[in-house]
Amino acid sequence: MKIAIDAMGGDFAPENIVKGVNLAKKELSDVTFQLYGDGAKIRQFLDDETAIEIIETTEVIDFHDDPVAAIKSKKDSSLVRAVTAVKKREADAVLSAGSTGALLTAGLMLVKRIKQVSRPALMSTLPTADGRGFDMLDLGANTENTAHHLVDFAILGSYYAENVRGIEKPRVALISNGSEESKGSPTVKEAHEILSAMTEINFIGNIESRDLLSGGADVVVTDGFTGNAILKAIEGTATVLMKEIKSAIMAGSVTTKIGGVLIKKPLSGLKDLMSTDGAGGAAFVGLKAPVVKAHGNSSELAIASALKQIHKMLESDVSGKLVKHFENMDK
């Protein structure tokens, strides 16, 4: 099992990327990690080179680069070389914390989408109060979607939740402005009608955004514009909430500060619950092989989690199962 890694992509590359590999190596003994980038810089942070392949590259795609232009002009970039390795079957999957647009473009151009998948989608596992989490897609790979795109997303998300996260008959829901079947845009209503008739998916109907963090569904489907907005709202709310709690305690009386010390451990647990470090990266589902995007400011723990996520994707052969599913639909 080989995972190609863009070692130069991300705000803290290559340090956090390589340190994340060091952590993942301790648990993933059957994986060879291919690190693409500046070999000298990569070796500064490696514990050792066991199960490591370092592939020298001379270019880096910047967050400000135009994705399509960069893929075409920077062919020796760490990101393009890593994705190309998957295309050539020199690696089984790819991970990058670099430019989202460039990774999605490279994935589509080089790895290719599964036949009959109308649109691949960006999907991530987000936290819930019960610790179970839920998968939401699309998170921004597409800004506009048809009902049939949403139906494909539901299939992709359901397969992922069942095979990678081990959820039996995952509950699939559509984001809408009300839980009633009559609520939603024409696109959502059409998707609702199609999904309701599908026996292979455990479709439970509509879900409102206020119920997401309560664990009302295992897979949540929406268009890319809405999904991206919800994702950023969740991230922002969690950050502000923790900051305001801390500020209120520090600005309070001596009694308040003592109370703050007493609740420090529970608050730490809440922070861990809302953290995405252990959830892995965002998977670009609908492609012929796993392509995973880690957050640009990922910690070494987040990188290790993303690598373990990819390992589960490969071990369960979720991409292969999706290829067969959509091939059968075409018959």
Swiss-Prot record:
List the subcellular locations. Answer: Cytoplasm
Instruction: Offer one example of a GO biological process linked to this entry.
Output: fatty acid biosynthetic process
**Entry keyword set:** Cytoplasm, Lipid biosynthesis, Lipid metabolism, Phospholipid biosynthesis, Phospholipid metabolism, Transferase
Catalytic activity field: a fatty acyl-[ACP] + phosphate = an acyl phosphate + holo-[ACP]
Checking InterPro entries in the record gives: FA_synthesis, Phospholipid_synth_PlsX-like
Enzyme Commission identifier(s):
2.3.1.274
GO cellular component terms, semicolon-separated: cytoplasm
Gene Ontology terms for molecular function: phosphate:acyl-[acyl carrier protein] acyltransferase activity
The EC category is: transferase
Q: Does the keyword Calcium apply?
A: no
Its pathway is: Lipid metabolism; phospholipid metabolism
**Endpoints of the signal sequence:** none
| Gene3D superfamilies reported in the protein's UniProt record | Isopropylmalate Dehydrogenase (3.40.718.10)
Q: How does it assemble?
A: Homodimer. Probably interacts with PlsY.
Task: Outline what the protein does.
Answer: Catalyzes the reversible formation of acyl-phosphate (acyl-PO(4)) from acyl-[acyl-carrier-protein] (acyl-ACP). This enzyme utilizes acyl-ACP as fatty acyl donor, but not acyl-CoA.
Record-stated family: Belongs to the PlsX family.
Q: This chain belongs to which protein, by name?
A: Phosphate acyltransferase
Traced from the root, the source organism's taxonomic lineage reads: Bacteria, Bacillati, Bacillota, Bacilli, Lactobacillales
Q: Which gene encodes it?
A: plsX
